[in-house]
Regions:
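Active-site neighborhoods and metal-handling regions in enzymes and metal-associated proteins
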Residues: 1-241
Length: 241
């Protein structure tokens, strides 16, 4: 019963989630601008934690994936350090008075992206847009995942959850917990309703090379989905305004 009630957020709850999202986005931008050659994931993570503390958020940890490690949604056990031309993926959370934000940014360090890096980044960016277009009040939550996945398959990824492609759900519910019902995953029949909150993170992963994940959370309104944070516009401006 409690979980059912928590699926729908009140205006006060949405305001706390907005505050957490604003802090999280600013902290990722801060860390990205201060990332240097040779840095470890732990050093980048420390930059994010420092920024969050300064801005008034509670840092709940993050996942920093560099180079080939970004090709696996949850990373690898190999040690990696930042090098020019490599992907840096930062997937981190923040809470304000117990309400969560979850944002991922992916950028190329120290140089122009390759044509393949740019293509995949643009495809994930498009995937976020497809998810938002599919997220309509009353439709099954799983239909959002289906819309993204069908497009990715038309681009040659998959099929379904196979790599290269997207091996995880398009999004998860978020609120007092980072991961809570309902999920944007194939087969989920729960209809979308105003006040529901989700991540939007249709990453693409190419084993042995790299991955790109862009993640912004949104909430459903009477007229459709609304982002808490604006997705960055391009790989050349990977943190946005």
């Amino acid at each position: 019963v409690v979980r059912q009630l928590r699926m729908i957020k009140s205006p006060a709850e949405l305001a706390l989630m907005q505050a957490a999202a604003d802090i999280m986005a600013a902290s990722l931008r801060y860390a990205g601008e201060r990332t240097r050659d040779g840095m470890t994931p732990e050093q980048i993570d420390a930059l994010i934690a420092s920024a969050q503390k300064t801005l008034g958020g509670s840092y709940d940890g993050g996942l920093i994936l560099i180079g080939e490690a970004s090709a696996y949604p949850h990373g690898s056990h190999k040690p990696h350090v930042v090098r020019k031309g490599e992907i840096v993926l930062m997937d981190c959370t923040c809470s304000v008075h117990g309400y969560q934000a979850d944002i991922t940014r992916t950028f190329v360090f120290g140089g122009a992206p390759t044509s393949e890096q740019r293509k995949v980044w643009d495809q994930v960016h498009r995937g976020q847009q497809i998810a938002m277009a599919a997220a309509k009040v009353g439709v099954p939550a799983g239909s959002v995942d289906d819309a993204v996945r069908s497009t990715y398959e038309s681009w040659g990824y998959g099929p379904r959850y196979k790599l290269p492609g997207t091996s995880h759900r398009t999004g998860h519910g978020i609120g007092m917990e980072v991961h809570e019902p309902v999920n944007l995953v194939h087969g989920e029949a729960t209809p979308l309703a105003p006040g529901m909150c989700f991540s939007n993170e249709p990453g693409i992963y190419i084993p042995g090379k790299f991955g790109v994940r862009l993640e912004d959370c949104f909430h459903m309104t009477e007229t459709g989905p609304k982002f808490f944070t604006t997705p960055p516009p391009s790989i050349d401006d990977p943190f946005g305004a």
